[in-house]
Amino acid sequence: EQNAVVGTANRLLARIAKRRCEGFTGSFAEGSDRRSTGNPVRDDIFATPVLSWDGSRPMHLLVLGGSLGAMPLNKLLPAALAKIDPAQRPQVVHQCGKQHLLLAREAYEQAGVRAEVEAFIADMAGAYAWADLVICRAGALTVCELAAAGRPSLLVPLPHAIDDHQTANARYLADRGAAVLM
């Protein structure tokens, strides 16, 4: 199970499985034959340089909407960033999903906020290395990549996810002081 909350299929299959593997320690009930394996993360993400932002340059803000794009992030962030004094405003790279690309670019333009808006980011290791702060959903693999890259984050879980697994994923980092759960 890749999430902090066991999904329906894995919950059903766990009854007949000889061993249960979990990406987040404690997903399966204690006493079950479980192995905390973690989730797979590419080596280049583990090799992300240590964060060294000292305030002498604009903050680098990476916004990740996931593969489908998170419409609330696409709409709210440009308007929120517009309220920041332009001299203090971060540099923004926003991954918004293919279907939201034009709308997200338009939202930044209307807000008067400069941003590099992309449908997809192929080099996630490079994106994490560039970022000082990440705002994103809380899918299991994204949360694990953030932990591996050592990047602080504001996590905005998908509100209608089955079993609210994204909130549990986000809480895993937030409870350890590695993220803020929104």
Description of each model-found segment:
Residues 1-48:
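Active-site-proximal region of nucleotide-activated glycan assembly enzymes
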Residues 5-10, 23-30, 103, 142-143, ...:
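Short, glycine/polar-rich helix-capping loops at beta-to-alpha or helix-loop-helix junctions
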Residues 18-19, 33, 126, 133, ...:
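Well-ordered beta-strand positions
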Residues 25, 66, 97, 139-140, ...:
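Short glycine-/small-residue-rich Rossmann-like dinucleotide-binding loops
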Residues 53-134, 166-171, 175, 182:
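Donor-nucleotide binding loops and adjacent catalytic segments primarily
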Residues 118, 137, 155-156:
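A short structural motif in glycosyltransferase catalytic domains
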Residues 129-144, 151-152:
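Acidic donor-binding loop of glycosyltransferase active sites
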Residues 148-182:
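Catalytic binding pocket for nucleotide-activated donors in carbohydrate/polymer assembly enzymes
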